Amino acid sequence: VSRGLGDVYKRQGMYCLSLSDGTRAWLNADSRLKYPVVFAENERRIRLSGEGYFKVAKDTQAPFIVETDLGEIRVMGTEFNVKCYPDETIIATTLVNGKVSFINSEVPERILAPGQQLLFERGNQEAEIRQVNVCNYIGWKDNQLIFHKETLEEIMRILARWYDIEVVFENNDLKQLEFSGNLNKYTDIETFFRLFGIGANVRFQLSGRTVYIKSAE
């Protein structure tokens, strides 16, 4: 049992910290990490809400466990990303190297290999494993936003967290527009809007901290 509990919440931008075992953790915007100031000898247990990337120090005697509200991810030493925002229906775990397992009381333990991503949906309690390009899911920790056929609704959800803004769509059809691209997270938000608006028949209007998304026609 640890002597104290650390609690880090990042409202905007990104935050990097080192844990007592040498593990490094990166937190994305609107994310919270709770962790022991000093880990116990037999396990290293933390709790994540939001999105985090972890480079775990190897220790075969003490598994590293990430608790989320949908289950646990267990590792010994590896690099992986966990996205588990409470307002989203799916938790996503993406493995860069090593091995991780996902544990939930409703489904059998699922083990990931490098380059695989596990998706677990809140509603139907089903887990899916798929092969992915991990760069698309971990670029945020290097200040890159990488989108591949991503809906405008999901893109704006990410930007809203990063820039701490509200988003209002004129109609639901605009939410389903798809975009691909690679942008720096510290780009001025109006530059994002200009790039997205090119050839997409969509217009962005920024008023205070609210973005109104409308058809350009």
Task: Describe the role of every protein-language-model region.
Residues 3-217:
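A residue-level detector for the "anchor" residue at the start of short, highly conserved motifs
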